[in-house]
């Protein structure tokens, strides 16, 4: 074991966190931990170039989303004495129970009499601990039915798609990050389910209509995809929107007011909405 390793820490606004995680994974970084309201990246190799790249990436996101404030802060890089931080990382991840769905890692035991979802959090995009994921898991247990054609839009690690498949849905997944697709497919294999279709890209590449769509993505992207999402809803389809900070909830509701809002949930500052495709102009 090498005597030294490098640790990079930064804090990023919650709604952009997955973008930074995906960026780091794309660069081949695997040892990532979310802790202390921020993100730790550790490596035996120097992380100076990654630190610089993260700052450039943050600047580009600020320009893309027309923001007037920094979305990344407290960026620091230190050299530390080595320890088995992979084992430390494993100790810090706890399983999640949401009603009858039990989400756990590959090194944790299953729970009897529950729908067990096994996730390898090292692959990409988390292990289901986020508030918005919690809301989606709760809603999917209510609205997932056998034989429904379903889409996990922005699938990340594939948790939501796997849950829908466990309930008998014919699931398709998509994400703009190819690593997320690979992660979802591997996690599906771990859980003994298959996705009917998976592609790198967004809903504009989807074919046909869906009975159930779940989009656990940031509000800005939901607003951009609003028309495409609606155009792929079957009559009476269910649409679950999540990953929405409460300060954006009014904008989301205004954009989707032609659909019937049938349920909603807020955990801390994170909002989730469930719509039914009973359009008012029908």
From Swiss-Prot:
Cell location: Cytoplasm
CDD domains linked: AdoMet_MTases
GO MF term list: protein-lysine N-methyltransferase activity
Key words, A-Z: Cytoplasm, Methyltransferase, S-adenosyl-L-methionine, Transferase
A cellular component term, taken from the record's GO annotations: cytoplasm
Gene3D superfamilies with a match to the protein in the record: Vaccinia Virus protein VP39
Principal cellular location given in the protein's record: cytoplasm
Pfam families from the UniProt entry: PrmA
InterPro entries: Ribosomal_L11_MeTrfase_PrmA, Ribosomal_PrmA_MeTrfase, SAM-dependent_MTases_sf
PANTHER family on file: ELECTRON TRANSFER FLAVOPROTEIN BETA SUBUNIT LYSINE METHYLTRANSFERASE
Sequence similarity: Belongs to the methyltransferase superfamily. PrmA family.
Protein name as catalogued: Ribosomal protein L11 methyltransferase
Name of encoding gene: prmA
């Amino acid at each position: 074991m090498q005597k030294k390793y490098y640790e990079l820490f930064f804090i990023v606004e919650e709604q952009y966190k997955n973008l930074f995680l995906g960026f780091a994974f794309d660069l081949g970084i695997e040892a990532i931990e979310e802790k202390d309201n921020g993100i730790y990246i550790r490596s035996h190799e120097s992380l100076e170039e990654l630190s610089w790249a993260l700052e450039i990436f943050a600047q580009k996101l600020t320009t893309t989303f027309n923001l007037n404030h920094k979305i990344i802060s407290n960026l620091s890089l230190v050299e530390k004495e080595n320890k088995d931080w992979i084992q430390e990382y494993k100790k810090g991840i706890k399983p999640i129970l949401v009603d009858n769905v039990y989400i756990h890692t590959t090194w944790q035991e299953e729970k009897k009499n529950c729908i067990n979802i096994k996730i390898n959090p090292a692959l990409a995009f988390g292990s289901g601990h986020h508030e918005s994921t919690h809301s989606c898991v709760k809603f999917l247990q209510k609205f997932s039915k056998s034989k429904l054609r379903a889409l996990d839009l922005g699938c990340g690690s594939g948790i939501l798609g796997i849950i829908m498949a466990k309930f008998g849905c014919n699931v398709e997944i998509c994400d703009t990050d190819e690593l997320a697709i690979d992660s979802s497919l591997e996690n599906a294999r771990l859980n003994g389910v298959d996705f009917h279709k998976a592609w790198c890209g967004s809903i504009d590449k989807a074919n046909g209509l869906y009975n159930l769509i779940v989009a656990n993505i940031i509000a800005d992207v939901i607003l951009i995809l609003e028309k495409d999402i609606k155009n792929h809803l079957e009559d009476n389809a269910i649409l679950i929107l999540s990953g929405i900070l409460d300060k954006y909830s009014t904008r989301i509701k205004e954009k989707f007011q032609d659909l019937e809002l049938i349920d909603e949930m807020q955990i801390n500052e994170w909002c989730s909405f469930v719509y039914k495709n009973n359009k008012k102009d029908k």
